[in-house]
Amino acid sequence: MSVTDCGLRAQARNHRRAPAPPPPDPRVAFFDQRAPTWDDDADDVRRTLARLAELRGRIGLVPGQDVLEVGCGTGRITGWLVETVRPGRVVAVDFSPAMLAQAAVRRLAAEFRWLDVCGEIAAAEQFAVALCFHAFPHFRDQPRALRNLRRLLRPGGQLIILHLAGSAELNHFHSQLAAPVCHDLLPAAAAWPALLGRAGLELVSLVDTEGLFLLKAVSPPTPARREAPRAAAARE
């Protein structure tokens, strides 16, 4: 066998071992197509913002927090976030370029970026809060999304998953839609502790009633911070 033959066979083996790129997420096209008319129902937009104002205390955002809004869409609630956490910073991300283009038109005091939270991410920044509003069911790989969100949170940072509908009504609504979102569901309540735990997050509270789904989880503090109270007690 010639050296050339050996080289070609080695190249073929390496080629076979190379992983195939993941297929594009069809949800991107789904939301891109709907972006221009997403906020046409002005009454629905007003109702959404009014409901968020009512829930502000329960959501728990406070001035000065740096917030990552995941699945910001057209920026429907981004302005509300900016006002709620001012002088904190809001970075709003989405995987739909067309949705982000609509959001940019609003000229809000927020930074809009493209991000696929289910893909490979470089966690160069960390935030006090990651908020997923009307977004989590559309994450094609929910366990991976949670792992990525954990990396994007500071130690002690909070994940908030919020829907202005309970999981039963939301899942029923999605099941009546066409592909690719007809199977986009919120997990059952009993599944959340393990799902979050595998991502390195701890469930703090879960409200799932008619008209509201509100989950809060926390990124555990660093070991040094956990041990600090015991060390202080020992010194006393």
Residue spans of the language-model regions?
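Class I SAM-dependent methyltransferase SAM/SAH-binding core
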Residues: 68, 74-119
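Short catalytic micro-motifs in class I SAM-dependent methyltransferases
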Residues: 134-135
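Core SAM-dependent methyltransferase catalytic element
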Residues: 205-236
